């Protein structure tokens, strides 16, 4: 088992006292050099960056309260240098000095596959411990593909595939191109954030608060802002921040539905139940440049095949039975059973009138009509809408894609959201 997964899977082995002592020991063991007047600090070796990942999560650290010596990544200390200097050359042999700088956060072999995050058991305490240390935090993000493990300089004058060095800056860890810095050309930015181009780039929240809120939102649909803050405890957030963060996660899910999971062929089929949901949706989604504080909504109609959890949508609302027929022919196979809320069905008329208008290609029913035919699993999925509808003004929120996501991933919803984020930002 990977050491990071061991920590998350076995939080009972850690106590607050041992965790604090281990973090203090690690903080005192790091070795950084002042590099220039900008307070940059080069990471001088691979072990320097990996010490948190391999040692902080190693149970032996908390048992012995000291780093293991002479094993794994912590070799035996070098023998003391001779003070006489008779056997020490004045100038080292050319090429004997190791390359300085760090071009990856982790070894590429330590970066997990997209599905491995699904095996982790997260809770608020684990996330708080991970992100309480900046170095361990970016190692966690790099391991699960939430930030790039390496960066290539995009400046035209740099050599092709020129890797950037990871350094510790006054504002945190950044990537810096040493070639650009050596040229000292004006108007060239030699440093970029480790979060640039990721979903965290526009965030102004501390990472511990951001991920703990994501976890609470995934596990508790339909809560009010007051209830979410009660779960957050000392990490409580202001109303605007909660609203923007929820909107951001819904945009991520909508983008995943539109670009990855949406069916390219009509869904449903003979005797299969397809649910119709009218919802708002966010326009002009963009992973790389969108500021999540600015949103413009449009109305969509979403079709969900309940048996196999497939989704398809049209970019127009349904005002009458002709619009319904047009949307069904585009998205749903003939012979399907179309279900919707009673209040939504009233827009098109009575059930028999609707079926006749559709030339009996589809059977139209309400949710109440088919409820006795649902098994317990499907009833639990339908109850997700009941929980989400407890939020005031729910009809003014783009919730249909969130409902579909929660249907698909009722278990470990937070883990699946992390996986979806990785898939989207690697495109």
Curated annotation (Swiss-Prot):
Lineage: Eukaryota, Metazoa, Ecdysozoa, Nematoda, Chromadorea
The protein's name in its UniProt record: Male abnormal protein mab-31
Induction remarks: Induced by exposure to nano-polystyrene particles.
Disruption phenotype: RNAi-mediated knockdown causes abnormal male tail development. Abnormal fusion of structures in male-specific genital sensilla (simple sense organs) known as rays. Abnormal fusion of rays 6 and 7 enhanced in a sma-6 mutant background. Reduced fecundity in hermaphrodites. In response to nano-polystyrene, causes decreased locomotion behavior and increased reactive oxygen species (ROS) production. Intestine-specific RNAi-mediated knockdown causes increased ROS production and reduces expression of daf-16 and sod-3.
Record carries keyword Zinc: no
Annotated spans, Disordered: 68-102
Annotated GO biological process: nematode male tail tip morphogenesis; transforming growth factor beta receptor superfamily signaling pathway
GN (gene name): mab-31
Keywords in alphabetical order: Nucleus, Transcription, Transcription regulation
GO molecular function (one): DNA-binding transcription factor activity, RNA polymerase II-specific
Chain's role: Putative transcription factor. Acts in a TGF-beta-like pathway during development of male-specific genital sensilla (simple sense organs), known as rays. Involved in production of reactive oxygen species (ROS), acting downstream of the TGF-beta-like dbl-1 signaling pathway. Involved in locomotory behavior.
Transmembrane segment boundaries: none
Location of this chain's protein in the cell: Nucleus
GO cellular component, one term: nucleus
């Amino acid at each position: 088992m990977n050491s990071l997964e061991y920590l998350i899977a076995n939080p009972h082995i850690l106590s607050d006292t041992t965790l604090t002592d281990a973090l203090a020991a690690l903080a005192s063991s790091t070795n950084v050099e002042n590099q220039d007047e900008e307070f940059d600090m080069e990471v001088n070796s691979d072990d320097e960056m990996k010490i948190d990942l391999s040692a902080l999560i190693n149970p032996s650290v908390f048992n012995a309260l000291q780093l293991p010596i002479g094993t794994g990544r912590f070799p035996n200390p070098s023998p003391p240098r001779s003070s006489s200097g008779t056997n020490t050359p004045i100038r080292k042999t050319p090429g004997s000095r190791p390359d300085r700088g760090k071009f990856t956060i982790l070894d590429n072999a330590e970066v997990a596959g997209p599905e491995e995050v699904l095996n982790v058991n997260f809770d608020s305490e684990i996330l708080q411990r991970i992100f309480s240390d900046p170095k361990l935090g970016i190692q966690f993000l790099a391991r699960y593909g939430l930030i790039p493990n390496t960066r290539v300089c995009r400046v035209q004058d740099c050599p092709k595939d020129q890797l950037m060095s990871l350094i510790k800056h006054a504002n945190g860890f950044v990537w810096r191109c040493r070639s650009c810095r050596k040229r000292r050309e004006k108007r060239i930015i030699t440093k970029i954030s480790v979060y640039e181009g990721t979903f965290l780039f526009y965030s102004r929240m501390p990472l511990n608060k951001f991920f703990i809120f994501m976890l609470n939102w995934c596990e508790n649909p339909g809560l009010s802002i007051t209830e979410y803050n009660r779960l957050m405890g000392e990490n409580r957030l202001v109303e605007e921040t909660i609203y923007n963060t929820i909107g951001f996660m819904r945009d991520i899910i909508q983008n995943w539905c539109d670009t990855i999971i949406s069916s390219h062929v009509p869904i449903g089929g003979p005797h299969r139940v397809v649910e119709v949901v009218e919802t708002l949706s966010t326009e002009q989604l963009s992973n790389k440049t969108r500021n999540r504080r600015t949103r413009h909504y449009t109305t969509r109609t979403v079709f969900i095949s309940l048996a196999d959890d497939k989704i398809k949508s049209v970019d127009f609302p349904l005002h009458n039975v002709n619009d319904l027929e047009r949307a069904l022919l585009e998205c749903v196979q003939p012979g399907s059973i179309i279900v919707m809320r009673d209040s939504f069905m009233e827009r098109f008329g009575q059930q028999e009138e609707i079926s006749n208008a559709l030339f009996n290609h589809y059977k139209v029913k309400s949710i109440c009509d088919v409820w006795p035919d649902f098994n317990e699993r499907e009833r639990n999925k339908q109850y997700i809408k009941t929980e989400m509808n407890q939020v005031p003004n729910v009809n003014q929120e783009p919730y249909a894609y969130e409902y579909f996501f929660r249907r698909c991933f009722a278990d470990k919803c937070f883990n699946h959201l992390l996986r979806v984020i990785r898939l989207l930002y690697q495109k």
